[in-house]
């Protein structure tokens, strides 16, 4: 996790990290950070972050028989304002986990977060 520490904001704390099929995902106290290794060697890397307060929907697909991986799809508000008169922009991020990883606990955490955000935004 040390190699990713430079991408943290001041006083941001890592709660948990995951090595995915090709990427690394960190969940901090503020956001979800996806380190997308690209190219044949994985030297090139794209870094995306999703503010935890913007997560509004989560879906999961467990691995089946064979070579399938498990997936968690995170839908989040990507526009700067959560309540915009002209509507908000929604984006989706798919995280692919190795077959052996049990995604249930992470799914539950993200779903509880999405539900709390939905309630807060719609008050």
How would you label these PLM feature ranges?
Residues 40-123:
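Acidic, Ser/Thr- and proline-rich intrinsically disordered linker/docking segments
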